[in-house]
């Protein structure tokens, strides 16, 4: 209703101003600004909804604050371009419409009415309401009900008798199991659901609506609210350190806790969370690649579900045989938005809806088949009688290719339990949320019936039953939940551990690299990983007076304030203000101790803008002084004009990538020498090893032969035509996820370059 009202007010404002208000520059600017704000808010809502399926929520702040890198970004480029073009077009059209009758005399009354209607349209828009609620949740002091309802469970289960298998189905919400809406979509897993305790009304609350948040909610009984933004949890060394979560209780009760997934464990800090709360055995993409049958059988996120669940079965079988009490948690990935992935072992690889194939539905049908096969293996084993199996979605599906059909239904998360010791079939329609999952499991295992804000749905009362406005209530508790982190509010002394790549201050530890925004009462960590914007881009958004401490590889800050370190991959510490003074210190000891020293200085706007402009230079445009092309740092030597066909820098160098260009091309500003040696330090990938690799300069071609290990080879060139471009053409680029960023499409690798040097040998 508010959406229709806001649109009606918007149109009324446009029409009244365009036809009645007349010409006045101030009123035109004010009205266009407010109407433009309405457009921006709604485009922001549309864009956020495209990613989350739930508008502007904490998932947007947490995952999309810094960058979409690592989130299958290629799939969103066209929508992003479309949104940008639409914004430009709408603003242009809006300005043109408002000035249609600019030659008419100005009328203050109609101008004021148009402006008030425009303000009303903004106030009534769902986007403004959502943003306002998020801002309020950041500014509240807390809610007195938090102390009443937050309960810490006993640290042990008195007499544990059952093992636990907990399966998180990525975005596998209960809505998919509605056979009337989606006939025969989930026959195998749906049949298993109907055999157990099926909780049909598991709602999603703020701070529980993406994978790591859903895991925290289900194991700790609290939403994931943190004292920082972005994916900073990937950089912390502990995760809600004061909380007692399900994993802690299981470990204290003698369980060995295992977690198996196909994606990288570091994504969004899952490894940190699990290690902080009782899990000693973690298996992700890196850990599995040496044990799976086919390491090359991967999708954009990691190993397919059939591979992961095969490994989970092996773990279950081995642990059951050992007689050791255990829990085995696993997380699927094939149903990840926007399209999902199809495991090759599925019997059904296609599901049609509305008369055409739908990739997301197909992925769901395939993944549920894999999960059901895993469960049926357990049920058929002699160990099922000692096992509880839990199947839940980590969160509701985000905006995938099935989302518009899901959104027509009453949407709930999936949560059902199969008890080997005590088979029980019942559908429970009690109102609940994902924070209740861990408490319900703990209750079945013989422990307390509460964890944090969660309550057992078998013997307790969920917050979803207590509060009609439970979403608003949880947001009101956000400051209370943030305080559970016990996060430092100041930094004076700090220690950089060069070997462990960590920084410690005020009792907290963070992974490097790291950027800190420091104010009088707050220290905000901003991390860098494959899944966030580079720290220099984040620093460029700081205000001129914002105090910062930046710990990163020296070459990344050298172009600004320490040119002598332009090729150093050591750690450096920079601090200061972008508009004031900055210092750079080289970390030259294993345990390097530093102090913050922020000086009150006069802000130089010109210096600030220069620093910001330099920080925003993209990697390929960075230039440094060197007599060779060093590939493990960003940019290129000053002599290089441009280059293509080369992937991002890694710790050892860079791969050629045929996705970016069929050949490696390095164009120099000036012609290469008439006669020179080309010294190449490199290695080959896959079938490119031990094969002739053409290297061309002008009309002359030499061949390079590389092995899988790094070697240095010198080629001799004559350049009578004064050519200025070096071309290397790997013969057999290999499509692979080797070393790839999680969620990105595979790269096509040919050779790995460490250094290329041109040596003039003209007499």
UniProtKB/Swiss-Prot annotation:
Pathway this chain belongs to: Glycan metabolism; osmoregulated periplasmic glucan (OPG) biosynthesis
Keyword Membrane: yes
Protein's cellular compartments: Cell inner membrane
Taxonomy, superkingdom: Bacteria
GO molecular function: phosphatidylglycerol-membrane-oligosaccharide glycerophosphotransferase activity
The reaction(s) this protein catalyses: a phosphatidylglycerol + a membrane-derived-oligosaccharide D-glucose = a 1,2-diacyl-sn-glycerol + a membrane-derived-oligosaccharide 6-(glycerophospho)-D-glucose
Sorted UniProt keywords: Cell inner membrane, Cell membrane, Membrane, Transferase, Transmembrane, Transmembrane helix
Broad enzyme group: transferase
Protein's membrane topology: Multi-pass membrane protein
InterPro entries xref list: Alkaline_phosphatase_core_sf, DUF7024, OpgB, OpgB/LTA_synthase_biosynth, Sulfatase_N
Signal peptide span: none
Catalytic activity, EC: 2.7.8.20
Parts of the chain that traverse the membrane: 1-21, 26-46, 77-97, 108-128
Family: Belongs to the OpgB family.
PANTHER family on file: LIPOTEICHOIC ACID SYNTHASE (PTHR47371), PHOSPHOGLYCEROL TRANSFERASE I (PTHR47371:SF3)
Function: Transfers a phosphoglycerol residue from phosphatidylglycerol to the membrane-bound nascent glucan backbones.
Protein name: Phosphoglycerol transferase I
Provenance organism: Salmonella dublin (strain CT_02021853)
Lineage: Bacteria, Pseudomonadati, Pseudomonadota, Gammaproteobacteria, Enterobacterales
Gene that specifies this protein: mdoB
């Amino acid at each position: 209703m508010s959406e229709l009202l806001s649109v009606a007010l918007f149109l009324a404002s446009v029409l009244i101003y365009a036809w009645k208000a007349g010409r006045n520059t101030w009123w035109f600017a004010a009205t266009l600004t407010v109407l433009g704000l309405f457009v921006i808010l709604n485009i922001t809502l549309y864009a956020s909804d495209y990613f989350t399926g739930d508008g502007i929520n904490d998932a947007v702040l947490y995952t999309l604050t810094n960058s979409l890198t690592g989130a299958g970004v290629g799939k969103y480029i066209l929508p992003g371009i479309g949104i940008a073009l639409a914004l430009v077009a709408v603003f242009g059209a809006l300005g043109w419409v408002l000035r249609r009758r600019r030659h008419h005399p100005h009328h203050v009354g109609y101008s004021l009415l148009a402006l008030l209607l425009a303000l009303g349209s903004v106030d009534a828009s769902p986007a403004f309401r959502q943003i306002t609620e998020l801002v309020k949740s950041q500014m509240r002091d807390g809610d007195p009900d938090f102390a009443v309802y937050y309960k810490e469970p006993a640290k042990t289960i008195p007499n544990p008798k059952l093992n636990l298998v907990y399966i998180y189905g990525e975005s596998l919400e209960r809505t998919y199991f509605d056979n009337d809406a989606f006939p025969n979509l989930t026959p195998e897993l749906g049949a298993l659901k109907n055999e157990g305790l099926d909780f049909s009304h598991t709602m999603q609350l703020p701070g529980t609506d993406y994978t790591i948040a859903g895991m925290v909610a289900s194991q700790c009984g609290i939403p994931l609210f943190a004292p920082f933004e972005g994916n900073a949890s990937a950089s912390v060394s502990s995760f809600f350190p004061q909380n007692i979560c399900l994993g802690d209780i299981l470990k204290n009760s003698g369980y060995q806790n295992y977690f198996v997934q196909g994606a990288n464990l570091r994504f969004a800090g899952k490894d940190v969370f699990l290690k902080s709360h009782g899990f000693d055995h973690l298996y992700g993409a890196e850990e599995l690649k040496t044990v799976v049958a086919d390491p090359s059988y991967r999708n954009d996120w990691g190993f397919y579900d059939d591979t992961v669940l095969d490994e989970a079965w092996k773990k279950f079988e081995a642990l059951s045989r050992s007689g050791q009490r255990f829990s085995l948690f696993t997380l699927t990935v094939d149903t990840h938005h926007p399209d999902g992935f199809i495991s090759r072992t599925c019997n059904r690889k296609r599901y049609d809806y509305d008369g055409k194939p739908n990739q997301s539905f197909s992925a769901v049908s395939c993944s549920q088949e894999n999960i059901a096969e895993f469960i049926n293996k357990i049920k058929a084993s002699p160990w099922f009688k000692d096992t509880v199996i839990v199947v839940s979605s980590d969160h509701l599906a985000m905006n995938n290719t099935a989302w518009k059909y899901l959104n027509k239904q009453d949407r709930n998360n999936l949560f059902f339990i199969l008890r080997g010791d005590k088979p029980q079939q019942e559908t429970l329609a009690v109102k609940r949320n994902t924070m209740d999952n861990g408490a319900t499991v703990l209750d079945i295992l013989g422990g307390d019936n509460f964890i944090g804000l969660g309550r057992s749905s078998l013997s307790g009362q969920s917050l979803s039953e207590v509060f009609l406005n439970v979403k608003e209530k949880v947001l009101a508790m956000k400051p209370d939940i943030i305080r559970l982190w016990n996060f430092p509010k100041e930094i004076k002394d700090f220690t950089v551990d060069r070997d462990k790549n960590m920084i410690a201050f005020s009792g907290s530890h963070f992974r490097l690299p790291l950027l800190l925004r420091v104010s009088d009462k707050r220290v905000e960590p901003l991390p860098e990983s494959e899944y966030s914007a580079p720290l220099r881009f984040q620093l460029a958004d700081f205000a001129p007076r914002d105090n910062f401490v930046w710990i990163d590889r020296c070459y990344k800050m050298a172009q600004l304030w320490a040119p002598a370190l332009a090729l150093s991959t050591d750690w450096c510490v920079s601090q200061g203000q972008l508009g004031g003074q900055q210092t750079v210190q080289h970390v030259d000891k294993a345990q390097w101790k530093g102090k913050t020293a922020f000086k009150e200085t006069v802000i130089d706007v010109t210096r600030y803008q220069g620093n910001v402009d330099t920080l925003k230079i993209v990697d390929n445009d960075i230039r440094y002084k060197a007599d060779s092309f060093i590939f493990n740092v960003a940019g290129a030597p000053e002599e290089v004009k441009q280059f293509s066909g080369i992937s991002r820098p890694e710790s050892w160098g860079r791969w050629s990538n045929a996705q970016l260009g069929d050949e490696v091309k390095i164009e120099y500003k000036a012609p290469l020498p008439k006669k020179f040696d080309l010294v190449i330090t490199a290695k080959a990938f896959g079938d490119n090893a031990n094969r002739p690799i053409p290297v061309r300069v002008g009309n002359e071609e030499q061949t390079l032969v590389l092995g899988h290990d790094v070697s240095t080879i010198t080629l001799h060139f004559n350049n009578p035509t004064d050519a200025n471009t070096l071309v290397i053409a790997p013969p057999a680029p290999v499509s692979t996820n080797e070393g790839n960023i999680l969620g990105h499409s595979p790269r096509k690798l040919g050779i790995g370059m460490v250094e290329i040097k041109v040596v003039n040998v003209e007499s």
